[in-house]
């Protein structure tokens, strides 16, 4: 079997071109069985050490991860009916295996024996942390529960894994399930050339004439921002805001209503089973924040600081619309459009006119120049690597001693059958192997930008540049780690509310004149962003800053409060919670038929359940960390080395607050965030 199955015994990088749906389940079954056998085998030993117990377990789990990682990645970037089915059928197997491990008394006792052994005192910080985390995770997998309750735990976890996947599929299908063809260009007045060309290319790819629009962000956003045709904006908003729900043009077709209810009900049951009062308490058991009240207070405090300014920003927008356009009522599909007009009126700048200054190669070489200056790390493209699509590129990161530190796949463009958004995921983690050698980490960096059109290179908006830098921040956290214990290397073991620190930190340079000098360069002439455009860009940075942060707070408070108070007996709780949160924080009145929760994948299909607050929580850390660069010089290699050594290389081996204090010399303060966000005191 292993002869013909490329997922078995992967050495090095995944053989993407050889992986077929029929390989998936047999490989997963075989590898899970190997893992079970190894566990039973190592437990027969009379005495447990790191070498005879942890390392063999790490190796066999690694073989399973190495097969599953490319499969899970393909499910996100090259989704097909066959692949989806193969992926789905493995979820219960993986879930059952992970529950079996988490409730294995023998394994638990072996970890406990290690913790209580004489050798434990000599272990490294990372080794100790990995063992302590494992013991905590046993507790959170129900190791102490009765057999009956353990079985129920397993059922819940397996069902949740299925539901998360179903939620995600519904959103993808609903996004792909709506399109609009427009033949008359006159109906598209105001749309920038790049958006028209992309829509034309999209139509041609389907053998159609005219302009094809979809609900993918590169297609949807330009219409909402620039298109004069209000009816089209409303139609697209309606389709987008009701995806995967019982409302809108595809009402009921891919409806997530029941999926969400069941997810929330099961999460509450899971939390209570493990002895917590609410799912938020369970969520925080592995996070930096100490208790639910601390998170709610943090979010409420930020909302209080931002709301008056948000109201003022909206009044200014309304005043502008009335004065310039005689418009007195703003619907949700008008906000983006008129905000863009107001922004141009105030700052004479728009995202579109900056695109020519951010061609793909210039932006990427600028990003690499930055990490060379601050971290002394070089990025070098490696050709001939097997990938899942011809547009995917592959790079190595090399340090000042010519050591390979890590590598990554870069997949930048939106295409069909690829889930939306931008993300970093790990392909291979850093670890010390049984033979003593070090495995270097590999990451996937995925975005959804417009591909090159005609003979022009891909041209990014400034917002997309920031997104790329953000994901690259996650990437270097994973790739530059110096921890050899895989459970706490890179992003492993990093509390969820601290994981956004490096990513949000990297965004800062996208707003610095000295950095933009080499991140930008006109695709025809190579000249960097002209001074006056740069000045306007920086002035416009905090345009509607409070309205933006209030939108983030709306998501964060909704997620946390919903998980904090959800009660399966009550009906309509999801929409009622959203309504009450909106009345607390939102300045823009929504419409009753909008269904944002139904496509809120972060909390129903991603890892952000009762954790969406993490973005803002970590931004307090990242803004304050960056303020040290502002004080000492934004390319200061000494400050850079300190950030690399104290934070990036440490992975999850120590508590984030300790690492932060080591870098900053004190606890984090909120002021830098408010200043960066343009929230006035």
Swiss-Prot record:
Keywords: Hydrolase, Metal-binding, Metalloprotease, Protease, Zinc. GO terms for biological process: peptide metabolic process; proteolysis. Its cofactor is Zn(2+). It comes from the Bacteria. Zn(2+) binds at residues 470, 474, 477. It catalyses: Hydrolysis of oligopeptides, with broad specificity. Gly or Ala commonly occur as P1 or P1' residues, but more distant residues are also important, as is shown by the fact that Z-Gly-Pro-Gly-|-Gly-Pro-Ala is cleaved, but not Z-(Gly)(5). Binds 1 zinc ion. It is an enzyme of class 3 (hydrolase). Its EC number is 3.4.24.70. May play a specific role in the degradation of signal peptides after they are released from precursor forms of secreted proteins. Can cleave N-acetyl-L-Ala(4). PANTHER family: PROTEASE M3 THIMET OLIGOPEPTIDASE-RELATED, SACCHAROLYSIN. Belongs to the peptidase M3 family. This is Oligopeptidase A. The lineage of its organism: Bacteria, Pseudomonadati, Pseudomonadota, Gammaproteobacteria, Pasteurellales.
């Amino acid at each position: 079997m292993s002869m013909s199955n490329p997922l078995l015994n992967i050495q090095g990088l995944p053989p993407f071109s050889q992986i077929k749906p029929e390989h998936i389940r047999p490989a997963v079954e075989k590898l899970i069985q190997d893992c079970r056998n190894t566990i039973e085998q190592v437990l027969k030993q009379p005495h447990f050490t790191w070498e005879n117990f942890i390392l063999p377990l790490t190796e066999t789990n690694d073989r399973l991860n190495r097969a599953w990682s490319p499969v899970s990645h393909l499910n996100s970037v090259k989704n097909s009916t066959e692949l989806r089915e193969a992926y789905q059928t493995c979820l219960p197997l993986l879930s059952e295996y992970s529950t079996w491990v988490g409730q294995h008394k023998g394994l638990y006792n072996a970890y406990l024996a290690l913790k209580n052994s004489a050798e434990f005192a000599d272990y490294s910080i990372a080794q100790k942390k990995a063992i302590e985390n494992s013991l905590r995770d046993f507790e959170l997998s129900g190791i102490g529960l009765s057999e009956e309750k353990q079985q129920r735990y397993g059922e819940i976890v397996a069902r949740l894994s299925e539901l998360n996947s179903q939620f995600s599929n519904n959103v993808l299908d609903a996004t792909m399930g709506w399109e609009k063809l427009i033949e008359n260009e006159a109906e598209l007045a105001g749309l920038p050339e790049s958006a028209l060309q992309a829509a034309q290319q999209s139509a041609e790819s389907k053998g159609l004439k005219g302009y094809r629009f979809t609900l993918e962000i590169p297609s949807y956003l330009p219409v909402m921002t620039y298109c004069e045709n209000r009816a089209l904006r409303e139609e697209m908003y309606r389709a987008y805001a009701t995806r995967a729900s019982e409302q809108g043009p595809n009402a009921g077709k891919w409806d997530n209503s029941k999926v969400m209810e069941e997810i929330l009900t099961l999460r509450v049951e899971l939390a209570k089973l493990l002895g917590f009062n609410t799912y938020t308490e369970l969520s925080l058991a592995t996070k930096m924040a100490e208790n639910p009240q601390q998170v709610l207070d943090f979010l409420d405090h930020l909302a209080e600081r931002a709301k008056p300014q948000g109201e003022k920003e909206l009044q200014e927008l309304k005043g502008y619309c009335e004065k310039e356009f005689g418009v007195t009522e703003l619907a949700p599909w008008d906000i983006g459009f008129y905000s863009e007009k107001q922004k141009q009126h105030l700052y004479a700048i728009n995202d579109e006119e900056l695109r020519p200054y951010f061609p793909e190669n210039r932006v990427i070489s600028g990003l690499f120049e930055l990490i060379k200056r601050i971290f002394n790390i070089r990025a070098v493209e490696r050709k001939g690597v097997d990938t899942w699509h011809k547009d995917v590129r592959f790079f190595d990161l090399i340090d000042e001693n010519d050591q390979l530190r890590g590598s990554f796949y870069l997949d930048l463009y939106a295409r069909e059958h690829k889930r939306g958004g931008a993300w970093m995921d790990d392909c291979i983690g850093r670890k010390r192997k049984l033979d003593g050698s070090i495995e270097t980490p590999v990451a996937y960096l995925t975005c959804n930008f417009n591909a090159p059109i005609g003979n022009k290179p891909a041209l990014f908006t400034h917002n997309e540049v920031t997104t790329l830098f953000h994901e690259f921040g996650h990437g270097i956290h994973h790739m530059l780690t110096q921890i050899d214990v895989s459970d706490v290397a890179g992003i492993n073991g990093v509390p969820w509310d601290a994981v956004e620190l490096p990513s949000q930190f990297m965004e800062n340079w996208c707003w610095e004149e000295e950095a933009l000098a080499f991140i930008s360069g006109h695709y025809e002439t190579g000249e960097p962003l002209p001074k006056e455009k740069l000045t306007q860009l920086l002035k416009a940075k905090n345009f509607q800053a409070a309205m933006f942060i209030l939108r983030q707070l709306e998501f964060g408070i909704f997620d946390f409060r919903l998980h904090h108070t959800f009660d399966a007996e009550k009906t309509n709780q999801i929409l009622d919670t959203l309504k009450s949160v909106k009345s607390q924080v939102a300045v823009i009145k929504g419409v009753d038929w909008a269904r944002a929760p139904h496509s809120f994948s972060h909390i129903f299909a991603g890892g952000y359940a009762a954790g969406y607050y993490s973005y803002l929580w970590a931004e307090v850390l990242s803004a304050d960390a960056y303020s040290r660069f502002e004080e000492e010089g934004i390319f200061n290699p000494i400050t850079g080395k300190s950030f690399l050594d104290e934070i990036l290389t440490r992975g999850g081996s120590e508590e984030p607050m300790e690492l932060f204090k080591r870098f900053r010399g004190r606890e984090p303060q909120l002021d830098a965030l408010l200043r960066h966000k343009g929230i006035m005191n």
